[in-house]
Amino acid sequence: MIQLFEVKKKIKKEDNELLNKYSEISKKTKEEVLKEYNTSESGITENKATELLEKNGPNVVVKNEKKSRLYFLFNSFKDKFIIILIVLAVINYFLSDALSTYIILGIAVISALIRYFQDYSVYKFNQELKAKMYTTTNVVRGGKEKEIRVEKVVPGDIVHLSAGSMIPADIMLIDSKDLFVNQSVFTGESVPVEKVAQSTNDAKEIFSISNVCLMGSSVVSGRATGVVIDTGFTTYLGRMSKEVETKKEPTNFEKGMNNITKMLIRYMLVVSVAVFVIYGFIRKDWLEAILFALSVAVGITPSMLPMIVNVNLTRGTKVLAKKKTLVKNINSIQNLGAIDVLCTDKTGTLTEDKIVLQKYIDVNGNEDTSILEYAYLNSYFGTGMKNLVDRAIIIYGNEKNVKEIVNDYTKIDEIPFDYTRKRMSVVVKSNKNNGYRMFTKGALEEILKVCTKVKYNGHVNELTPEMVEIVEQKAKEYAVQGMQVIAIASKREYRGVNVFNVSDESNMTFIGFVAFLDPAKKDVKSTLKKLKNIGITTKILTGDNPYAANNICNLVGLENTETLLGTDIDKMSDEELAKKVEEVNVFARMNPLQKERVVKQLKNNGHVVGYMGDGVNDSPSLHIADVGISVNTATDIAKEAADIILLERSLKVIYEGVLEGRRVYGNIIKYMKMALSSDFGDVFSIVIASIFLPFLPLLPIQMLLQDFLYDISQIAIPYDDVDKEFLEKPKKWSTKGISKFMNVMGITSSLIDVLAFLGFWFLFGYNASKETFFQTAWFVECLISETMIIHYVRTAKRPFIESRANKWLTLGTFGTIIGTILTPILLHNIASFHFEILPLKYYGFVILLLAIYSVLVEIIKKIYIKKNGEWL
């Protein structure tokens, strides 16, 4: 994973080139820049825009390569198991009959084609969803303002910006009014920076150029017009994205599948060679030994594994899409179900991301309507873009009928807000006595700087150091409750002038406070409880102050005994942090690298971590997390780094996604454990039979047909239900767990087969003189028992009574059982299969074996669960 400082180091040379280029452009006049880009204030024409779009490409900073059907078709046949089947078919063609070769090829082709259709279906589905996720911007073309998609912006476009706008490209400003831009995606600093339509400095960093706005930034307040000077990968953001775009580590699911594949290939080679040697030495027929070993190899190969896995993942992708979740990497669905720690910010996830006025109080802590009135006048008469604080004051004032007070005053002037003073003032004249008043609101420390008096206990007093301490203590009381505290001051003006400036903000009287809360989302408390109930610990990683973070945690019921600050983390060793991340649920004043370190340490502690973020600075944590989660309003780089994109920023959506991830995992693990234990049991039985029987227990062609019919019975597994109890705990991929289950159930299956062999030989007389009857009998018994036992393996509960399979799986399994009974009858006259018609009493014996098998499996299930804590 590339760290941000490494990214900046790598692009330092290009960064300097771009800095020099933009610095030169920034020093040019508006007319010179318009001429250089062959444009005007009326914008370029549509024809010119089309030409430039073809020349420069779309205005995007992440690659979206289109993939053809041929790509997916070729990729489907690249699967290891498909390749093994094809190789076995080729060998079989030269050593045996054509029919068995066609059966092997048929299995391989059908599996590959199903995977092709499923993979291509997911790709098309995701492309359609991505097409619906776009951002627009306002440009002037041919003298007319219009709204276009950001990817269609070209150099020379004239762009209009206002509060809330995303900067759609790298832009040089040609006009601005009180413009403040948030550049935290590059700098990590949340404080907006003022931008003006003329160069005011010799910048040392590209984002410090005063009249250049960079793609990926956003407008906090004010308005502006600019000329697009770079788009796409030539922008600063685009150059960064080339370095941030790195191949993500394989998910636990991908690692697990690779391990299983390697294990099965080794197992197939060892068993096939063993069968070949044993059969060859005992029978002295080495050609038949090769054919039989090849058939065993095919039987061991879970040919439907790619299809079952992909159908499961595809179905999960489509289900999540309906729940407002876009899955970019389908293999991350299983990881989503495995999450046991979720790291997220509080703003917009736990809260509504809109502030509400809660208090208007004096220094004594008493409600004072005059404070609300002063704040209302300040916000109402301010001509700049109304920020969240202004809107909250006006909305609350209207509800309290304070708005009538504006009729008593006439606005004279204002001193706009800026991020140096962190305050804003308006001067009004009373319509009753013509007296002038200045009302100022802003950050507590900045308001105190311009005050010499304070209203306290109903009287105006000198603002002594002792009084400052009282004021600060009262403000802290509300800050501890998680409130944003804004200070209010006023003074009377007697100069009789109508123009005021910053120097007039002096000798003021401190009046009191207005306090705000970003309220918790209504469903967050219940959703956090649900997440906890399914084994997920939620941890807050925020850049906000610890008071606000702890308050919102109290409101939503998030348990926390200690809050860790970013500065605390910097002082800790990895060993100390490893302990703290287990104990602490709230991390405040965090920068991106500190967040990444916490996520990394949680992973090192053995957790499966989900990380939710939406900025460029979140990309390191999104990359390193087991599941990176972003939102559709996030920066392009954040969305590219994420595995999953939410169309709605909500913990409820994540909760539903986790459950779906566990359903997907549950159905995949069902198939894995069923198929592998069945294959292992069959092979174990074959080895035993090869030693003691004077003939093959199954012919190669019968074995291939049996394997094919068994696979068909499991096609509906992706649509099966999963027990509620299974969804209550995180599910980690465990190759050892699969291997252990395979051994236990495989041996159990072989015990039933041995009973069947004894019954066929001694009860029915299917001995050397009736080997075709023996082979037919085992073909039917083995396939029926393997198919029926699906219902016992799929749940930790009692099948048919406490847990029932989905109707499609039920139809599939019972359909296969009926097909199995009919197969010897229908293929009796085809010599290649060597099937016989079995007597009715044989099926009574099979029913007895099934009863014994069922009871045995239920006993083993209880013992296995008691010892291992789980069944699937």
Regions found by a protein language model. Name each.
Residues 83-103, 263-301, 314, 318-324, ...:
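Helix-interface capping motifs at the ends of transmembrane segments in multi-pass membrane proteins
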